[in-house]
Amino acid sequence: MEISTPLDCAPALVGPLPRRNSRAAQIRWGDRVVHVGGDAPVCVQSMTNTDTSDAIGTAIQVKELARAGSELVRITVDTPAAAAAVPAIREQLDRMGVDVPLVGDFHYNGHKLLQDYPECAQALSKYRINPGNVGQGAKRDTQFAQMIEIACRYDKPVRIGVNWGSLDQDLLARIMDENAQRATPWDARAVMVEALITSAIQSAQKAEELGLPGSQIILSCKVSAVQDLIAVYRELARRCHYALHLGLTEAGMGSKGIVASTAALSVLLQEGIGDTIRISLTPEPGAPREKEVIVAQEILQTMGLRNFTPMVIACPGCGRTTSTVFQELAARIQSYLREQMPVWKEQYPGVEEMNVAVMGCIVNGPGESKHANIGISLPGTGESPAAPVFVDGVKVKTLRGERITEEFQAIVDEYVRTHYGAQTPATV
C-alpha cells in the first residue's frame, strides 16, 4: 500500500466563499437601523405565534425574541383587529425600551389593511408581501401596486416572499405550458424552481417600476425540501442582486427541523448566499419561541460567520465518564452565559468570542481546556477526584469538593471582568 508523503506547502484551509454582492437594505425604527445585505453581517430574524390582536401578549413575545437576539421580528397582520393592534404593540415595546423593528406579514388582504389602517403601516418597519396570494387576475396587479405605493409613501422596505405552497397559479400554469412545448421538457421540480424564481424577480421588477428602490427590496423563495431550497437560491442568487432572506419553510419539530434547516442554510451560507435568516421551527407544546433564534445564531456562530455568545465546548461522554457532573456543569455554564449576554454584550465588548471548555475525563480534557480561554477537565471514572482549571492555556488551580460548579462559574465571571471590561456585570 502506497503511503502519501506530506506536502511542502500547508494544507488548504476551507472557509466560506466571499459574500455575494447584494444591494443593502436598511430596516429602521427610531435610532435603530438593521442593515440587510451589502457587506452587513447575516441578520437573524424570527416570528411571533401570538394572536396579534392581543397587543400585550404579542409585545411580550416580541420582547422575549429580541432579548434572545432576534434583530427583526415578524408579526402576522391578517385582520382589522390585528392591524389596529400594531400601533399599540409598537408603543408597548417602546415603553419597555425594545427598539427591534417589526415586520408585518400580509396575505390576501394586505392592500386593504395597509390602506385602512395608516397607523399600522407607519408602525411597521418592513412589509412582507406574498405575490402568490396578493390577488387574482387583474386584481393582483392593482392590489400589489397599492401595497408598494404605501411602502413608498412611508419609506418602508419590502420582502417579496414567494412560497411553493402558495405560488401564483396563473404564472405556474404559463410556465407549465411553456415547458410542455420544449423538445425535452423539464421535470416537475425544475418547473417549480423556475416558477418560484420568476415570481420573485418579476414582482421585484414590478415594484421598482412602481417607484420602490431596489435597495428597499428583499427576496425569498421558500420550499420545504433541502435540495430544492439549495437549487432555488443558487439560481436566484445568479439572476439578481437583491438581498436574500433564507429559510426552509415548514421545517418541522425538534431535531428534524433543526437538522433540515441547518443542512440547507449551511450550504448556501458557505457559498456566500444569504443576507438574513429565519429558522421556521414548529415548537413543542409550551416550549419557548426563542428556540428558533438560538438555532439561527448557533448556525452562524459554528460556521464562523458571527459571534453571539461565548461558545461552550463539551465532550459527548463515554464509558470513561459515568458521572453526570460534567454534563450538568456544561449545561449550567451554557445557560448562564446566554442569560448574561444581554448585559455582557453592552459592558464587555468581545465577550461573545470567548470559548469555554467543559470536559469529562483525562483523555482530551486537559488538551481541549488548554486551547479554550477557560477550561475545566472533570475527573472520569476511576480518576482522581480533582478538576484542573486552565486559563489561556495555563493551569491556574484545581477544584475539588461539592462546589466545583459555583467555583468554576466564579472563575468565568472573573475572566470576563478582567479581560473584556472593568465593571462588575449586573445579574440578569
Swiss-Prot record:
HAMAP family: IspG (MF_00159). Keywords: 4Fe-4S, Iron, Iron-sulfur, Isoprene biosynthesis, Metal-binding, Oxidoreductase. Binds 1 [4Fe-4S] cluster. Transmembrane segments: none annotated. It is an enzyme of class 1 (oxidoreductase). Its EC number is 1.17.7.3. Gene3D superfamilies: Dihydropteroate synthase-like, Sulfite Reductase Hemoprotein, domain 1. NCBIfam families: ispG_gcpE, PRK00366.1. This is 4-hydroxy-3-methylbut-2-en-1-yl diphosphate synthase (flavodoxin). PANTHER family: 4-HYDROXY-3-METHYLBUT-2-EN-1-YL DIPHOSPHATE SYNTHASE, 4-HYDROXY-3-METHYLBUT-2-EN-1-YL DIPHOSPHATE SYNTHASE (FERREDOXIN), CHLOROPLASTIC. InterPro entries: Dihydropteroate_synth-like_sf (IPR011005), IspG_bac (IPR016425), IspG_bac-typ (IPR004588), NO2/SO3_Rdtase_4Fe4S_sf (IPR045854). Belongs to the IspG family. Its cofactor is [4Fe-4S] cluster. Pfam families: GcpE. It comes from the Bacteria. Pathway: Isoprenoid biosynthesis; isopentenyl diphosphate biosynthesis via DXP pathway; isopentenyl diphosphate from 1-deoxy-D-xylulose 5-phosphate: step 5/6. It catalyses: (2E)-4-hydroxy-3-methylbut-2-enyl diphosphate + oxidized [flavodoxin] + H2O + 2 H(+) = 2-C-methyl-D-erythritol 2,4-cyclic diphosphate + reduced [flavodoxin]. Converts 2C-methyl-D-erythritol 2,4-cyclodiphosphate (ME-2,4cPP) into 1-hydroxy-2-methyl-2-(E)-butenyl 4-diphosphate. One of its GO terms (molecular function) is 4-hydroxy-3-methylbut-2-en-1-yl diphosphate synthase activity (ferredoxin). One of its GO terms (biological process) is isopentenyl diphosphate biosynthetic process, methylerythritol 4-phosphate pathway. The keyword Amino-acid biosynthesis does not apply. [4Fe-4S] cluster binds at C315, C318, C361, E368.
